[in-house]
Each structure stands twice: as structure tokens, then as C-alpha cells.
């Protein structure tokens, strides 16, 4: 088995590389290219196995959803005096916002572990530059 880090030939039974001691059986993340919001509900182990590009796209989706939940929550909280909003609606809006905040923090934590920082803004320009680097 050839080490994907240093290129050293190892026996097929080896767990780690004899030269650099990198794990040989660990698969590198592959670019998925199709991400949707519901993937953020998957467990940490699944999210950590995603490609960095896919995580950035997913983080962008989660941040957008979190923003819309925040605006909904604020609209419900600041309802005019004549409008009575049931408490369960308020609680639902707040819980949705907290839920997407927690999911956002999980993805940001994985990105910090990989990149050393979390991007403040994930726009098309950032994703295009990263995609170009991946393809070359």
C-alpha cells in the first residue's frame, strides 16, 4: 500500500506508514459538489468526513437559514401591541434560531481545525478560487 502523504511503499497489512507514520487506511474526503441544508443535521463524524469545499458551501447555507430564522424571531418578538402572538410560536422561533446557531458552530469548529480560521464571509468569489485550486 502506498502512503498518500509521502508516497512510501508499505506492506498491505500495515496500519501506519513506516516512514512518516501517517494512517494508511484513512480515506481522504472527496468533493461532493451537491450540498443541501438538511446535511447539517448529520452527526459530527459525518460532517468531519466532508471535503472542506463542501463544508464551506454547507456553512453558507446554514448561515443563510440562521439569518432568516433570526429575522423571523425578531418579527415575532416585536409584533405590534394589537397583535397577540402565542408563546409557542415565540418559543419555536427562538429554538430554530438556537438550533441553527449550534449547527453553524459545529461546522465552523471543523473548519477551524482544518484551516486554522473560520471565514467571516463565504461568497462566490471565495468558493470559485478554492474550486480552481482544487481542480489544478
Q: What does each of the following model-derived ranges do?
A:
Residues 29-89:
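Long, charge-rich boundary regions
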Residues 9:
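Catalytic-site/binding-pocket detector for metal-dependent nucleotidyl cyclases
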Residues 21-31:
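Short Cys/His-rich micro-motifs in 6-15 aa windows
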Residues 3-6, 17-20:
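Short cysteine-rich clusters marking metal-coordination/redox-active sites
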Residues 111-133:
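Long amphipathic alpha-helical coiled-coil segments
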Residues 58-61, 65-68, 72, 88-92, ...:
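Charged, solvent-exposed faces of alpha-helical coiled-coils
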Amino acid at each position: 500500500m502506498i502512503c498518500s502523504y509521502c508516497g512510501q511503499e508499505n506492506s498491505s497489512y500495515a496500519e501506519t506508514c513506516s516512514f512518516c507514520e501517517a494512517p494508511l487506511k484513512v480515506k481522504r474526503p472527496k468533493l461532493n459538489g451537491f450540498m443541501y441544508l438538511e446535511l447539517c443535521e448529520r452527526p459530527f463524524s459525518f460532517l468531519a468526513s466532508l471535503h472542506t469545499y463542501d463544508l464551506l458551501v454547507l456553512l453558507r447555507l446554514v448561515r443563510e437559514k440562521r439569518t432568516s430564522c433570526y429575522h423571523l424571531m425578531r418579527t415575532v418578538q416585536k409584533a405590534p401591541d394589537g397583535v397577540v402572538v402565542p408563546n409557542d410560536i415565540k418559543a419555536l422561533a427562538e429554538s430554530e434560531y438556537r438550533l441553527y446557531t449550534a449547527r453553524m458552530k459545529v461546522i465552523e469548529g471543523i473548519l477551524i481545525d482544518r484551516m486554522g480560521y473560520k471565514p467571516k464571509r463565504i461568497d462566490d468569489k471565495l468558493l470559485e478560487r478554492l474550486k480552481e485550486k482544487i481542480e489544478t
